[in-house]
Each structure stands twice: as C-alpha cells, then as structure tokens.
Amino acid sequence: MRCFPINDTRFGRELINSICEFTVCILTCHSLSMKRNRCSKSNFFIPNFPTWLDFLLLGLKASSVPDNRCSTLALYFSFSNWKIALLSLFISLSIRITCFPFFEKNRIFLYNSFFCEVYCSKNSCAS
C-alpha cells in the first residue's frame, strides 16, 4: 500500500477530479431521466442491490478516469435522497485512495463512458 501526502498536488488534483467526474456522471443521467419524465425525483435513488452496485461501478469509473467537469458540483446535493448520494461519493473516494496503484497501471481497461452508460441504462425507469 502506497501513501500519498495530502499536500501532494498531483494526488490532490486527481482526487478533486474524481469527485467532479463522479458528480457529473450522476447529474447527467438524472437530468436526462427527469427531462424525459420517466422518473420522479422522489424515487430516483432506491437503495436496492443493483443501485448500490451501480454506485460502486461509478466509483471505479470516477476513480480511474478523472475529468475537469466541475461546473455542476454545486448541484450534487439537490437529489431527494442526498444521504445515498453522499455515501456513494465517499465510496468512490475510498476506492480512489485505496486502489490508486492499480488504476495507474490499468486505466486503459476502464473506458471513460462505460460505467456511466451502465448507470443510465439501469436507472432510466423505462416502462
């Protein structure tokens, strides 16, 4: 296990990017489903097994391919079930810190949009 000091600018930058990427992915899928009137805001986050698995996959995705799209970060807590959203964010950060050496070697296998597409397909509330 490698240790990364908090004042390491590269580690700090990637940690922030992980938060932003994870946030944008969820917000994008949420806004699309709301725009199509397929889901109601009250039932979008359901704490069942597939949803928790999706959050873990999103954490892996956000941890492996950080991005700089932070413009919607302030909207993160607008979800109806903010506790689940916040917990999923901490899960993604934990994965990022714990598995940093693995992701550094295996980024090529974790494509940028794959996990976001998985999340959208599982949470589209299609009839």
UniProtKB/Swiss-Prot annotation:
It is found in: Membrane. It is a single-pass membrane protein. The keyword Membrane applies. One of its GO terms (cellular component) is membrane. Keywords: Membrane, Transmembrane, Transmembrane helix. It comes from the Eukaryota. Its main location: membrane. The chain crosses the membrane at residues 84-103. Completely overlaps MMS4. This is Putative uncharacterized protein YBR099C. It comes from Saccharomyces cerevisiae (strain ATCC 204508 / S288c) (Baker's yeast). The lineage of its organism: Eukaryota, Fungi, Dikarya, Ascomycota, Saccharomycotina.
